[in-house]
Amino acid sequence: MSKFNRIHLVVLDSVGIGAAPDADKFFNAGVADTDSDTLGHISETAGLAVPNMAKIGLGHIPRPVPLKTVPAEADPTGYVTKLEEVSLGKDTMTGHWEIMGLNITEPFDTFWDGFPEEIIQKIEAFSGRKVIREANKPYSGTKVIDDFGPRQMETGELIVYTSADPVLQIAAHEEVIPIEELYRICEYARSITLERPALLGRIIARPYVGEPGNFTRTANRRDYAVSPFQDTVLNKLADAGISTYAVGKINDIFNGSGITNDMGHNKSNSHGIDTLIKTLQLPAFTKGLSFTNLVDFDASFGHRRDPEGYRDCLHEFDRRLPEIIANMKDDDLLLITADHGNDPTYAGTDHTREYIPLLAYSASCTGAGVIPQGHFADISATIAENFGVDTAMIGTSFLADLV
C-alpha cells in the first residue's frame, strides 16, 4: 500500500538556492557561476516575502548565509532540503530528466557561434523562407525579437537562434508566419538535429505578437524534445497502470514518454496553477503523480535579469500555495522544487548552476524539519518507492524521512 496515494510535484522553473559545488565549470558571459544564488540574491536585492513557503520550512534550508528576508519559522509544517545535480548540464531538460531518475553523462551539443550553415540552408530549403544570419547565435529570446522582429515583419524571414543551452529556437510573428507553419518548420528542424554533430535537446517554437518596440511572446510556444534515452520513473508508473498527469511543458520535456494524461500548456503561471488545481479535483485521479512546470520565473524574469519581476512572480505563487494545499487530500504529498538556477542579478542571460530547493508537505505527516541533502534523482527514487515500482535508476529515496 502506498504511503501517499497521490504525489504532486511542482517545479518552479529556475528557482535555484545557491551555487552548486561544480559551478566553476559553468559560465555566463565568461563569468563562472560560482557566485550565483537565485533565491538569495532576489531576497537581498529585491526583498522576498513568501510566508506560505516559509511556513513549510524554506528558511530552514541549510545555506552559507540565511535568506535575508525569509525567516526560519519556529514551527515549520513540512520537510526541506536542497539537492545537487550530477548531470553535465544546467538546462531545463537535463534537470527534469535527472529529477525523474536519469544521469546525463554526455551533454547535448551547444553552438556558441551559432548553427552550421548546413543546418541553416536545410531549414531554408524546407520552409521556403530565408533565415536572418545575424540572429544565428546565442541570444536572449526577448532581445532577439526586439532586434530582428521589425525586419521579419517586413521580409518574412525566419529568426533562428540559440542560447547557452542545447536548443534551436525559431521566433515568428504570428501575423507574419502562421502558427501551424512555424510548428511544421520546427518539426523539420527536430528531424535534422537528432544525432551528432548536432544533437539538440529541444527545438522551440517561439511565436510572438505586437509592434516594433512592444513585442510580446505568446503562450503558443511549443517544445520538440527528444525522448529520454531510457525509462524514467514516469514510464515505470505508467507501465504499472499508475496515472501520471502533466501540467505545462512537462509533456514536451519528456516527449510524451511515460505521460498518461497531458493537461495542456500553461498560458502563465497562474493558468498553470489553475490547471493543477483542476487536476487535483478530477474524480478519476485517485492514485498517481501530477507533475507541473511553472515557467514564468525563468522565461519572463530570469533570462531578462529582472529581480523585481522574479520576486513578484514568487509572491504570486506563494499567495496561491494555500489554494493548492486546500485541494489536496490528507494522504497526498506535495513536493516543490526547481530544475536549475537563473539568477536575475547575475552576468549574462542564461541559467546558473545551482542547488535546487525541496519542500515536502503532507497533512498526514506529523513531523517536520530538515532532511539529508541529496541529489535531484532522490525525488524519482522517493516516488518509485512510494508507489512500489521497480527502479534501478540513480537516487536515494527520502520517503522514510517523511513521518
UniProtKB/Swiss-Prot annotation:
Cofactor comment text: Binds 2 manganese ions.
Entry annotated with the keyword NAD: no
Subcellular location(s) of the protein: Cytoplasm
GO biological process, one term: 5-phosphoribose 1-diphosphate biosynthetic process
Gene: deoB
Required cofactor(s): Mn(2+)
Molecular function, one GO term: phosphopentomutase activity
Keyword terms of this UniProt record: Cytoplasm, Isomerase, Manganese, Metal-binding
List of residues binding Mn(2+) 2: D298, H303, H351
Family assignment from sequence similarity: Belongs to the phosphopentomutase family.
Keyword Disulfide bond recorded: no
GO CC terms of this entry: cytosol
SUPFAM superfamilies: Alkaline phosphatase-like, DeoB insert domain-like
UniProt binding sites for Mn(2+) 1: D13, D339, H340
Pathway the protein takes part in: Carbohydrate degradation; 2-deoxy-D-ribose 1-phosphate degradation; D-glyceraldehyde 3-phosphate and acetaldehyde from 2-deoxy-alpha-D-ribose 1-phosphate: step 1/2
Pfam entry (one): Metalloenzyme
Protein's organism: Streptococcus equi subsp. zooepidemicus (strain MGCS10565)
Catalytic activity, reaction form: 2-deoxy-alpha-D-ribose 1-phosphate = 2-deoxy-D-ribose 5-phosphate; alpha-D-ribose 1-phosphate = D-ribose 5-phosphate
Function: Isomerase that catalyzes the conversion of deoxy-ribose 1-phosphate (dRib-1-P) and ribose 1-phosphate (Rib-1-P) to deoxy-ribose 5-phosphate (dRib-5-P) and ribose 5-phosphate (Rib-5-P), respectively.
InterPro entries according to UniProt: Alkaline_phosphatase_core_sf, DeoB, Metalloenzyme, Phosphopentomutase_DeoB_cap_sf
Name by which UniProt lists this protein: Phosphopentomutase
EC number(s) recorded for this UniProt protein: 5.4.2.7
